Amino acid sequence: TKFYSQNKIGINQENEGIGMTFKYGDYKGEMIYRNFNKEKIILRFPKSAALDEYTVNDTWIKIPWEIKEEVRKIGSFNCKKATGEFRGRFYTAWFTEEIPLPYGPFKLYGLPGLILQAEDSEKMFSVNMKSIEYPTNQEFEITEPVEKERKNIKEHVYAQDHIEDILLEKLNSKMPRGVSFSKNLSKKDTKRVYKIEKLFEWEN
């Protein structure tokens, strides 16, 4: 399965003789590639102001779902409720056995049916099915994303946790002598409060 989003943003700012241009994002966007036969998950991140595009070999984690008795209708599908914890967040998911595929959005998978709706308890993550065609006669070619730079999951997490430091170092390396940027340390998200993944398996 593959999830993607496109993001292209350009910023051009001139102030006191200093010109800066940031362009990031690309037509490929962010991807989550999963191979269920090989239990393999590859992430792809587009170019940002701080980092070039790169891929990540993530860890295949089976979420310990607990299926509840509650049911609801989503669109034309009968769905069951399931709850589970994944990397520091507690999720509620609604899946349908009418589409008996263990897939879902983001990194949520492993239920006996397709996940059509999911949300974490703090509402930092929320996804709802808008429309679906099942079965379908369309054929899709899904290929593993490849980039020159590859990181393991620990390297990726470190980079994201220190993204401000990396960007600051990059900016300062391009500034004239005597000119530098500094950051507001009070705004650093040290506990990953605003990130979807808050706690990783090696941090327990």
Regions found by a protein language model. Give the residues of each.
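Extended soluble regions of mature proteins
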Residues: T1-N204
